[in-house]
């Protein structure tokens, strides 16, 4: 418990565990990847339901999560673009989603009808880093979103070498 509190205070991942939808079925979660960001998304929709989701982490697609079937829509994020807010619509299953990005773009998957909820990070500057939820044979029953800060870009500048001379006050 103390470890979780410490991580929260240090700006660790937001694991509030909020799930949208009625729930039930098998659990799923995207792979935890601390070296790559979400760079793309595939969502399969069929029979007015969201069947499955799949995220692209860096250059590789993670496993497809959810039920089989449906028509797949694919979105590729631009370099430096992140998902910053999501709207979801439920009846008995997830019916649709709208994902908003840091570059003022948005993507519709399915239809926004039923009970509509919004999901966004609790801290300014956080972005979508993972998706989790539950699914049954027909589609996704509940969905949740993990938020954290984007990865820092590695610096291209070489480290500064400090040298001290015998005449400098620091070198004495």
Curated annotation (Swiss-Prot):
Location of the Jacalin-type lectin domain: 17-149
List of glycosylated residues: 161
Predominant localisation class: secreted
InterPro entries, per the entry: Jacalin-like_lectin_dom, Jacalin-like_lectin_dom_sf, PolyBind_ProtTraffic
Tissues showing expression: Highly expressed in pancreatic cancer tissues (at protein levels). Also expressed in the placenta and colon and ovarian cancer tumors.
Function statement: Plays an important role in pancreatic tumor progression and metastasis. Promotes pancreatic cancer cells migration and invasion through the TLR4/MyD88/NF-kaapaB signaling pathway, without the involvement of the TLR4/TRIF pathway.
Family: Belongs to the jacalin lectin family.
Protein name: Pancreatic adenocarcinoma up-regulated factor
GN (gene name): ZG16B
């Amino acid at each position: 418990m103390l470890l979780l509190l410490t991580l929260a205070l240090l700006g660790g991942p937001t694991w509030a565990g909020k799930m949208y939808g009625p729930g039930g079925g098998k659990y799923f979660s995207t792979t935890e990847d601390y070296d790559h960001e979400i760079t793309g998304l595939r969502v399969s929709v069929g029979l007015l339901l969201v069947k499955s989701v799949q995220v692209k982490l860096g250059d590789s697609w993670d496993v497809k999560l959810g039920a089989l079937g449906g028509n797949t829509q694919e979105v590729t994020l631009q370099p430096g673009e992140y998902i910053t807010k999501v709207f979801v619509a439920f009846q008995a299953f997830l019916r649709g989603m709208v994902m908003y990005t840091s570059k003022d773009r948005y993507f519709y998957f399915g239809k926004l009808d039923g009970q509509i909820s919004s999901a966004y990070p609790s801290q300014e500057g956080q972005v979508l880093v993972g998706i989790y939820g539950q699914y049954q044979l027909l589609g996704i029953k509940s969905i949740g979103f993990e938020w954290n800060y984007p990865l820092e870009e590695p610096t291209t500048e070489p480290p500064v070498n400090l040298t001290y001379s015998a005449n400098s006050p620091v070198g004495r």
